Amino acid sequence: MSTDRRQLLTLVAGALAAPSLARAQSPGMSRVTAFAFSFAGLEGGDIRLSEYAGKPILVVNTASLCGYTPQYAGLQQLWTRYHDRGLMIVGVPSNDFGAQEPGTPIDIMKTAHDDYGVTFPLAAKAEVKGRNAHPFYKWAAVERPVETPRWNFHKYLIGRDGHIAAVFPTEIEPMDARVIDAVVKELDRVE
């Protein structure tokens, strides 16, 4: 085989291997997982994601005065249906988009608990974008840089391995078949 042909084959083999190398070194394959983070709880205490290691976790930035606030009801339905199988949901109230979460913890609890019957854990109000974002959201922005929250009710599904398994933008309702399919896939996954 000629030197030119050998160099060409080496170049082609390298080009074919590059995508798999890129996947192996992609941000989603970082050593840090979601289980490294915790949120202050809206009603006190901490919500430690490490306590749910090995289970899927849906982390959703929420707001009480948003056109999407009725998604609380869908999140509660999802929680009711799959919590006993291991699904964890964490709502993270945020005032980052349209100043639609200006209230106090009592105001937030009234909206979530009284108006929508929410029983899944809610974090204390936190920033989800920018340099003051909660560490979980900074990590998620590295894991999935083009799928960061652009509005309220952005959903990150954390897989059993602690990495982001799926991302659902605001417009996708919690009971949408795509969300349910992704949740069930993670629940059925054997580690």
Give the ranges of each region predicted by the language model.
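Thiol-/selenol-based redox modules, centered on thioredoxin-like
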Residues: 138, 142-191
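Thiol-based oxidoreductase modules, predominantly thioredoxin-like and allied folds used
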Residues: 87-103, 120-130
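N-terminal "domain-start" segment that seeds a small globular fold
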Residues: 25-50
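Short active-site neighborhood of thiol/selenol oxidoreductases, capturing the structured segment around
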Residues: 51-67, 89-90
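Conserved redox-active cysteine motifs that mediate thiol-disulfide chemistry
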Residues: 61-74, 100
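Short, internal strand/loop/helix patches
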Residues: 106-152
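N-terminal secretory signal peptides and thylakoid transit peptides that target proteins
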Residues: 1-15
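Conserved helix-turn-beta segment immediately C-terminal to the redox Cys motif
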Residues: 56, 70-92, 113-116
